[in-house]
Amino acid sequence: MKNGGSMQVQMKLGVMMRDLLQVEDEAWGLYAFSRDILNRRILPETKTEMIAKANACGKAYAQRIIREYGTRDVRVIADKLKLKLEFQSALMTGKRVLFACYTPPYTIEIMEEPVRRAAELVQEEEQALVELFQQAGIMNTILGHEIFHFVEDQFAHEIYTRTEKILLWNLLGFKNYSTIRTLSEVGAMAFTQELNRLSYPPFILDVLLYYSYDAASAEKIYRDVLGVSSGRCREPVEDY
């Protein structure tokens, strides 16, 4: 009974991963926007432009780091940047599992248990997926993502993901602007994809890493992403 149930779960994961591998970068960015508190305050065409710029930003800064340090190895880069890496088993925040965290100025925490569990799940899938999602590769992808957030801090005055802002309110000549969290995430994904020479969008790890903890939530992410990708999910834009 346990073996049969396990096989059913594994097959389901494989189907989701294969579908998600076909999703374009723009759709992943729109999915990320759909979870952003500022989502409805930005026009659809503006989001598309922002996503493209954030992707270009992430890739450009990855190439800059590669040129400066002469390597794509994220562990070596982290060492050269004087980052302190801490590896934990797992960390819960409310009902959610935290996979990694950058704490300024120099600390990156990565949770090893979710990565191990994800890699073990993939082992039961077809060889093409096994090769894409090795444990070491997943770990390097996550590390690259967090390194980008450090890079953002270092170049906050010029990096697109920090300089692009949205006007929150304008009262009696006083204006309040906010950065857009989604752009930081899109940039980080593009950065680690470029550093690690990934053939897949790193956003897909949101599904893979969650799956061993909460398959229902992972499936919801999967369906939401496909909904955005197909154009079925449209949200109104607020007037402000």
Positions of predicted regions on the chain:
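Metalloprotease/metallohydrolase-associated module, dominated by Zn2+-dependent proteases
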Residues: 163-240
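Residue-level recognition of short, structured coil/turn motifs
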Residues: 70, 156-160, 197
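Conserved binding/catalytic microenvironments
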Residues: 103-119, 134, 156-159, 165-166, ...
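Long, positively charged binding patches that form subdomain-scale interaction surfaces
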Residues: 126-142
